Amino acid sequence: MFAVVKASGFQRLVEVGSVISIDPTNVDSGGFVHFPVLLLVDGAEVVSDPDKLRLARVSAKFLRKLRGPKVRIHKFKNKTGYHKRQGHRQGVYVFSVTSIERGD
């Protein structure tokens, strides 16, 4: 069974056991979160009806916090000698999908 969920403003294709990385949310260590389901695929059956999807539920367990790759920003202005370097690393939370329930 597959599901498309909305997580941190992005759509992710998940199945039970898959690991996803998203932007930080409010969750405790070892806690569970539930993602809204946008599409559900169970074998040959595809569920896209919003009324049925409100009952569906995808649960994921929080695994760990990570930091993403370093992004380097360099501002430069010609002929003035002005330049500025700056770096940024975005925080990332890693979740493992534990269950996908249809809610029928």
Curated annotation (Swiss-Prot):
Question: Gene Ontology terms, cellular component aspect?
Answer: cytoplasm; ribonucleoprotein complex; ribosome
Q: Does the keyword Protease apply?
A: no
Example GO biological process term?
translation
SUPFAM superfamilies noted in UniProt: L21p-like
Question: Which NCBIfam families does this chain map to?
Answer: L21
What does the UniProt record say this protein does?
A: This protein binds to 23S rRNA in the presence of protein L20.
The record's similarity note reads:
Belongs to the bacterial ribosomal protein bL21 family.
Subunit comment: Part of the 50S ribosomal subunit. Contacts protein L20.
Task: Please give the name of this protein.
Answer: Large ribosomal subunit protein bL21
> Which species is this UniProt entry from?
Tropheryma whipplei (strain Twist) (Whipple's bacillus)
